[in-house]
């Protein structure tokens, strides 16, 4: 999908399509990441779907690794790990003892929300195309779209296969490291994500403690970027207060989420002050 690219990407896509008739190219006006994905999902005829962001790249055996897991465990979703690399550098190769397993969909969603093995990113995963036949699409016009979508796809699959090979390479831009500025769009997107997820409590109720931990990490991520005096700060604090005791008492919660939950009893200013001090060190 050429989502309104201003460089030669569209031409490059057309050249690839001439070399391989299986490749379909769609040229469209820029509509954002979710819109580009949805347009592709609507016209795909393949049996499987995977997503690769335009800045990232994968290993030569990316598809084969994920497909082999699906074949071996007879499931509809497979997940692998990823490397993160900074602009101008190369990913570090980490050699680990190979490990793979297969879990129920509920266990997989739990581990994803606890951020124990993998996270909610749409990439580094292979999905059977039938999972999208239920009407699942990525919410347009917002950021954090994967948080509101990936668990729904996993829930549609009875089982989920996983391996710890790092076959996806995610580019971390320098402005992301330095901290991109907070915007009203990010807050509006966060509220939309909450609204979308809360409309599926029939699913999330099965993993409520894990869901609360993931949302707590999400809320504190927003808080640390949010300027003091921001009008929706109190609304965010209200959501934090509603689940902080549950997260604080949950031994599977991330250490940072538990510490932040404890500090929140002393006010949001204390949370921001402590974490900014840690970052400077």
Question: What would you call each of these model-derived segments?
Answer:
Residues 33, 54-161, 170-182:
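Donor-binding/catalytic cores of nucleotide-activated saccharide
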Residues 22-24:
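Short, conserved active-site loop motifs that form the nucleotide-linked donor/cofactor pocket
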Residues 12, 28-44:
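Glycine-rich, basic loop-to-helix element that forms the pyrophosphate-binding segment
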Residues 49:
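Short aromatic/hydrophobic "clamp" motif used to bind/position activated sugar donors
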Residues 228-281:
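Membrane-interface aromatic/basic loop that binds lipid-linked glycans or pyrophosphate carriers
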Residues 210-222:
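Amphipathic alpha-helical repeat scaffolds of TPR domains
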Residues 167-174, 180-206, 230-246:
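Catalytic core of nucleotide-sugar-dependent glycosyltransferases
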Residues 2-12, 29, 53:
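A conserved acidic beta->alpha catalytic loop
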């Amino acid at each position: 999908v050429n989502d309104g690219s201003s460089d030669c990407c569209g031409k490059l896509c057309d050249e690839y399509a001439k070399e391989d008739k299986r490749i379909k190219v769609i040229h469209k006006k820029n509509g954002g990441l979710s819109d580009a994905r949805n347009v592709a999902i609507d016209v795909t005829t393949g049996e499987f779907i995977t997503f690769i962001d335009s800045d990232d790249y994968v290993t030569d055996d990316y598809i084969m690794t994920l497909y082999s897991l699906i074949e071996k465990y007879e499931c509809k979703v497979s997940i692998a790990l990823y490397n993160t690399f900074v602009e101008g550098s190369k990913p570090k190769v980490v050699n680990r003892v190979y490990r793979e397993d297969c879990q129920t969909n509920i266990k997989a969603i739990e581990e994803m929300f606890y951020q124990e093995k993998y996270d909610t990113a749409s990439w580094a995963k292979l999905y059977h195309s039938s999972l999208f036949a239920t009407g699942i699409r990525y919410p347009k016009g917002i950021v954090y779209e994967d948080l509101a979508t990936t668990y729904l796809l996993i829930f549609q699959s009875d089982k989920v296969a996983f391996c710890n090979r790092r076959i996806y390479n995610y580019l971390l831009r320098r402005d992301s490291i330095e901290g991109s500025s907070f915007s009203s769009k990010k807050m509006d997107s966060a509220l939309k994500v909450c609204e979308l997820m809360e409309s599926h409590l029939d699913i999330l109720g099965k993993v409520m403690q894990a869901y609360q931990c993931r949302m707590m990490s999400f809320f504190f991520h927003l808080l640390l970027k949010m300027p003091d005096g921001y009008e929706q700060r109190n609304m965010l604090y209200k959501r934090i207060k509603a689940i902080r005791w549950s997260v604080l008492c949950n031994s599977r919660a991330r250490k940072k989420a538990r510490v932040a939950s404890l500090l929140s009893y002393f006010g949001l200013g204390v949370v921001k002050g402590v974490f900014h001090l840690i970052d400077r060190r």
